[in-house]
């Protein structure tokens, strides 16, 4: 068994909702936590920067009120994603607010920094760092991260190319802390499979785009419902980092999904212009074949829980 920090031990369902750039907002995060999964959002979704404090207040107060009203069914903790890349000139400001409001979980991406980890630890928070290979995993833990988000092939948005079997196996050879697995997980059976191969949690993103609370265009939500894994394109053109995107949105932008040029990774920018790259090019993972309708977050999580229980039961019968 993995050694889990106290904040993760309290989770009754092994799911962390991934932070969705532009799409995640307090409404979605609160709904996710109330449904029993870790809700998360990127700090950079709050624009201007001052809005982040308003959002943190909204989330913490809503979850506190829920826990007071439902002591027998407390909300799951929430997480804030920080882009630890040199182009993010808001990092220090945003981390200071996370410290002020004692955000339970910090998810770091695109760079591991000891000072960011120390800031989270200063108030008892934990840090999960997302990685795409074993080399980056070791660096993250060496710099003080408490756990890892293993971003395997098929994940929506920024994604790696490693098979989840290979990635989890290599990390588990030396690391016994918390691991969340990301990559084409959109039903309860896949959540159980992630645990079976050595992960503690499933890290799910694309399925939450097609929810009523998500801050995504209705066309985007419907495109996810209508699409399958055949409609996913892997490219680094849009942000400088390789990721998975819906082909129809690429065509709509006047580009050929089959012939996209390579981008210069040195020109990655997660500052003020970053939002433009994601506005009309829709990130999405390969697991969307399991998404057949737009529904509430509570309904989605209820489906995942039901499928998870059914998958467990079927294995016991076999």
Segments from the language model and where they lie:
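Conserved active-site-proximal phosphate/metal-binding subdomains
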Residues: 164-180, 186-318
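Active-site entrance/lid segments in N-terminal catalytic domains of soluble metabolic enzymes
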Residues: 1-158, 162-178
């Amino acid at each position: 068994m993995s050694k889990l920090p106290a904040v993760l031990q309290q989770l009754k369902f092994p799911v962390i909702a991934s932070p969705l750039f532009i799409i995640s907002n307090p409404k979605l995060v609160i709904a996710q936590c109330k449904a029993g999964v870790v809700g998360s959002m990127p700090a950079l979704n709050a624009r201007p920067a001052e809005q982040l404090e308003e959002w943190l207040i909204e989330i913490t107060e809503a979850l506190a009120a829920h826990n007071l009203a439902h002591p027998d069914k407390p909300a799951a903790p929430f997480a804030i994603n920080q882009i630890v890349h040199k182009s993010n000139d808001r990092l220090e400001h945003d981390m200071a607010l996370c410290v002020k409001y004692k955000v339970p979980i910090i998810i770091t991406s695109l760079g591991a920094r000891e000072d960011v980890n120390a800031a989270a630890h200063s108030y008892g928070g934990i840090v999960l760092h997302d990685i795409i290979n074993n080399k980056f995993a070791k660096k993250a833990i060496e710099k003080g991260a408490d756990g890892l988000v293993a971003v395997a092939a098929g994940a929506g948005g920024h994604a790696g190319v490693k098979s989840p079997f290979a990635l989890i196996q290599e990390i588990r050879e030396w690391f016994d802390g918390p691991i969340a697995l990301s990559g084409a997980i959109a039903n309860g059976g896949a959540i159980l499979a992630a645990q079976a191969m050595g992960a503690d949690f499933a890290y799910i993103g694309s399925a939450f785009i097609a929810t009523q609370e998500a801050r995504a265009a209705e066309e985007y939500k419907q495109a996810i419902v209508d699409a399958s894994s055949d409609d996913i394109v892997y490219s680094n053109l849009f942000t400088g980092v390789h990721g998975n995107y819906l082909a129809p949105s690429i065509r709509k932008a006047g580009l050929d999904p089959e012939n996209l040029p390579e981008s210069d990774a040195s020109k990655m920018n997660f500052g003020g212009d970053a939002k433009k790259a994601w506005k009309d090019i829709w990130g999405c993972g390969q697991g969307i074949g399991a998404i057949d309708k737009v529904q509430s977050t509570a309904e989605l999580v209820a489906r995942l829980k039901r499928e998870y229980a059914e998958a467990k039961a079927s294995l016991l019968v076999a």
